[in-house]
Amino acid sequence: MHLTSREQEKLMLFLAGELAAKRKARGVKLNYPETVAYIASHLQEAARDGVSVAEVMQYGSTLLTVDDVMEGVAEMVHEVQIEATFPDGTKLVTVHNPIR
């Protein structure tokens, strides 16, 4: 199987997001890379499921709270931006201040 660079990046993002989800489920507070991966991977999956761009952006701000992340991480994550594959093509999705 040959994966393009873009496909490799998507796969790495998915794996990092899965690891972050497992840690969150165990009650471990997420660090910066885990936080971004968790949000980004959930956004990718929502887009792939056919959710609209606006709904994906709104969904991104409901995934984590300040209680889910390590101290200071919420202030560091001003936005999460991904290129997501929707049924009608690839689009840029930006979630501003995703941790509330």
UniProtKB/Swiss-Prot annotation:
The keyword ATP-binding does not apply. One of its GO terms (molecular function) is nickel cation binding. Its EC number is 3.5.1.5. It is an enzyme of class 3 (hydrolase). One of its GO terms (cellular component) is cytoplasm. The keyword NAD does not apply. It catalyses: urea + 2 H2O + H(+) = hydrogencarbonate + 2 NH4(+). Pfam families: Urease_gamma (PF00547). Transmembrane segments: none annotated. Pathway: Nitrogen metabolism; urea degradation; CO(2) and NH(3) from urea (urease route): step 1/1. One of its GO terms (biological process) is urea catabolic process. Keywords: Cytoplasm, Hydrolase. It is found in: Cytoplasm. It comes from the Bacteria. InterPro entries: Urease_gamma, Urease_gamma/gamma-beta_su, Urease_gamma_sf, Urease_subunit. Heterotrimer of UreA (gamma), UreB (beta) and UreC (alpha) subunits. Three heterotrimers associate to form the active enzyme. Belongs to the urease gamma subunit family. This is Urease subunit gamma. The gene is ureA.
